[in-house]
Amino acid sequence: FNDQTVYLCEIADITSDKIAVDLKEKQNINTELPVDVTICSGLIKADKYEWLLQKATELGASSFIAVSMERSIVKLNEAKVVKKIERWQKIIKEAAEQSYRLVIPSIQFESNLKLICDTIDNYDYILIAYEEEAKDGELSNFKQTLQQFKAQDKVLMIFGPEGGLSENEISLFSNTSTVVGLGPRILRAETAPLYALSAISYEKELMG
């Protein structure tokens, strides 16, 4: 599991702690999004973030970054990070198995958004979902950008917490990102990533 390959197997042996199988036939099955999407979002209330992780995993996110942002109501100290990561990873693993994913998305925590700037070279596209763009009626940037996505492209999508992204945080990526609105309505922090993933799935999987 987690190498994006599916095999028809025959059980060869079962013990108390493992199952040995013989590989019989490789299966032509792919349940992964054509593009690699990392969801970077500000910390939000625990139940909402866990729901986001579950649903975004079902919708095809490849990895998650939880970030303590300027307007995050929830704060996470170092003593709690390890236990939180363990719980989040368990939720992600269960959602991946339930939705027949071929990979288990990863998750990490960063104490501020500046640390993400050091990783921008890892991505082909960086998109920032900004509610002010929606208020101003911006409707085309997201559509135009996702139409450019090619198979295996790596996409980083950044979402704010309940209070949204600050102008300072937006400015960190001013020269490297595309700021997008997600339709004419203002979405909740836990809903916006799901909207984006659904749009990507529709464009790259259903429209082909």
Ranges and model annotations:
Residues 126-164, 168-170, 177-181:
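Active-site/ligand-binding-proximal alpha/beta "capping" segment
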Residues 2, 43, 110, 130-132, ...:
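Fold-independent oxyanion-binding glycine-rich loops
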Residues 1-28:
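N-terminal positively charged helical leader segments and presequences
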Residues 28-128:
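RNA substrate-binding interface of SAM-dependent RNA methyltransferases
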Residues 4-6, 16-18, 32-36, 59, ...:
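Short connector loops at helix/strand junctions that flank enzyme active sites
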Residues 166-208:
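Structured adenosyl-cofactor binding patch, chiefly the S-adenosyl-L-methionine
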Residues 73-74, 136, 189, 196:
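Generic structural signal for helix capping and beta-alpha/helix-loop junctions
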Residues 14-18, 28-31, 78-79, 118-125, ...:
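Short, glycine- and charge-enriched coil/turn segments that flank and shape catalytic ligand pockets
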